[in-house]
A protein has these predicted regions:
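Extended active-site neighborhood of metal-dependent phosphoesterases/phosphodiesterases
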Residues: 27-36, 40-42, 95-187, 191-193, ...
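N-terminal export signals
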Residues: 2-28
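N-terminal active-site segment of His-dependent metallophosphoesterases
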Residues: 25-99, 191
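Short, solvent-exposed loop/turn elements at domain surfaces
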Residues: 56-61, 166-168, 257-259, 284-286
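Short, glycine/acidic-enriched loop or turn micro-motifs at the edges of active sites
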Residues: 56, 91, 164, 205, ...
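A mature extracytoplasmic/lumenal domain signature
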Residues: 52, 161-164, 203, 278
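Active-site neighborhood of phospho(di)ester-bond hydrolases with catalytic His/Asp-centered motifs
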Residues: 51-52, 83-87, 116-121, 198-202, ...
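A short C-terminal boundary segment appended to hydrolase-like catalytic domains
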Residues: 266-317
Length: 317
């Protein structure tokens, strides 16, 4: 059956018009983002790159993966105005050498004029981070934590510090937590916030316990986190029986283990749309020379790459 015969049959039963006008339906119009780029010279002011779990170890495998991500970002035209990292910049113990290596790897981004914001994860050490990135540490909103605010024309980002430092420099504390001082600061900051805002941390909502504060801020449109080394999205409800939900997104690792890649977030007029760029999957270390890639690893990366996650600025409920 050719296309003309097929459409003729649809017309005969009254379906052709309804099928061909789907693009004009209210739902279709709602689904189409209102995209009008704010380009300033070489930069897209509405483009944000999100990365996490770099685990930079000099002489390890992770610097090569992070270098690839940096090169891909620099190849974008226009360039994103902001890159935001959500913790575990250092490998395991937050050594100064890890941060020094990371600084060299990130240098091309800052030399290109891209704003770089780096949050804390459970493998970081604040003092060592501040020693290598002093200009970033001084911008923290709280004296004893690394808490940052990134402002863009259409939405802002609050990067919390969920790191719990072990008194033993040879150990780390895996679970995350938000200090009471941060909780109080976040509550005060979000009170009356009118602009769309994302709240982010290294750890998930189960550990940071900030969901009640986000619920009370209608302009909070999403929660971003890392730590799990996997691409994962969700929409937790605030209260059963009510319509309120909050979109959440877990970032992949740039190159340690698990889902490997980064997320490109575009801020449109009425929503933000995240796109996953996943290059591969491996556990718990990359393939050795001559080793065959497991089919499931390849399928994981294939299934995830190009996935989207959208955040409406008008939160339901």
């Amino acid at each position: 059956m050719n296309r003309r015969t097929f459409l003729g049959g649809l017309a005969a039963i009254g379906l052709q018009g309804s099928m061909l006008n789907v693009s004009a339906s209210p739902l279709a119009r709602m689904m189409s983002p209102k995209r009008k780029k704010k380009v300033s010279g070489r930069f897209d002011e509405d483009a944000v790159i999100l990365i996490s779990d770099m685990h930079v170890l000099p002489n390890g495998h992770t610097p090569g993966y992070l270098t690839r991500v940096v090169k891909e970002i620099l190849a974008m035209n226009p360039l994103p105005r902001n890159v935001i990292g959500l913790g575990d910049l250092a490998n395991l113990y937050g050594h100064v050498e890890d941060y020094e290596c990371a600084r060299q790897l990130f240098a091309p981004l800052e030399e290109a004029g891209i704003n770089l914001t780096l949050g804390m994860g459970n493998h970081d050490r604040r003092e060592n981070f501040a020693r290598v990135f002093p200009e970033k540490a001084v911008t923290t909103r709280l004296f004893d934590r690394m808490v940052f605010v990134v402002k863009t024309p259409r939405a802002d980002f609050i990067v919390l510090d969920s790191l719990q430092e072990s008194p033993d420099l040879g150990k780390w504390i895996t679970p995350g937590a938000i200090s009471q001082e941060q909780m109080d600061w976040l509550r005060d900051t979000l009170r009356g916030y009118q602009k769309p805002v994302f709240v982010a941390a290294h750890h998930s909502l189960d550990e940071t316990k900030v969901l009640p504060l986000l619920r009370d801020c209608p302009s909070c449109c999403g929660y971003l986190f890392g730590h799990e080394h996997r691409w994962r999205t969700d929409s937790p409800v605030f209260q059963w029986g009510k319509r309120g939900i909050l979109r959440t997104m877990c970032l992949p690792s740039t190159g340690y283990w698990g889902d490997i890649g980064y997320v490109q977030l575009h801020l449109d007029e009425d929503r933000a749309v995240a796109t996953l760029h996943q290059s591969e999957y491996f556990f718990n270390y990359p393939l050795k020379e001559g080793e065959e890639r497991p089919l499931q690893w390849a399928l994981n990366a294939q299934d995830n790459d190009g996935s989207h996650c959208s955040f409406s600025y008008q939160r339901p409920g």
